[in-house]
Amino acid sequence: TLNAPLVSAQKFDPALLLQAITGPDREVSDFIRDPIRKPVQVLDFLGIEPGMIILDLYAAGGYYTFIFSKAIGPEGVVYAQNTVRGRQFVEDRQDITQGQALDKKIEQGKLSNVVQIIRPLTNLGLQPNSLDAVMVAQVLHDYYNPDPERALNMLKQLKVYLKPGGVIGITDHVGIAQYDNNELHRMTIAQATVKCLHSSFTMPSQCKKG
């Protein structure tokens, strides 16, 4: 089986990353999500570069873990975090658990720069100021909707691990204020923005939408 190589350019190259994530070592079930999730544009917007140290919070089946691994190259590290319980959830579009899906991605993709963390956020075992970036993909609403303070506490905990100037990337299902976003598993951009600002994060001049 041919595997697409890890990107090794000194700076982020969207064309190289696109080539790396369209190889035969990637799951088709992940590939078909790309038109909606736009991962190359997301990483470009976040300023991801080779050699970075990144935490993929609740990596689940590893959609972003795989992409980050290819983007940061052999000198970088991706920490793919899941809880024991989370690893037991069924992976979308597959008849395996999320933990099994992630294990499979790491093995088949030869993702030697991925380190799994099977611990809760409150006990990650990482050093403060050690991360260049944290990815929170389709997760923040799960913290916010039961109790907005949980989302605030989560963001504050993550900020401790970021280096000065580090970035947190948040992607989520966009909710509409008058709808039941808890039932729909969504949250509004305004809700996410307020919690980020209250966590002492600074926001870019324009958040990407869509």
Residues covered by each model-derived region:
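Conserved class I S-adenosyl-L-methionine
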Residues: 49-60
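A short glycine-rich, Lys/Arg-flanked "PGG" loop and its adjoining helix->strand segment in the class I
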Residues: 69-70, 149-164
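Conserved beta-strand signature within the Rossmann-like core of class I S-adenosyl-L-methionine
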Residues: 79, 165-173
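S-adenosyl-L-methionine
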Residues: 92-124
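Class I SAM-dependent methyltransferase Rossmann-like catalytic core
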Residues: 16-49, 63
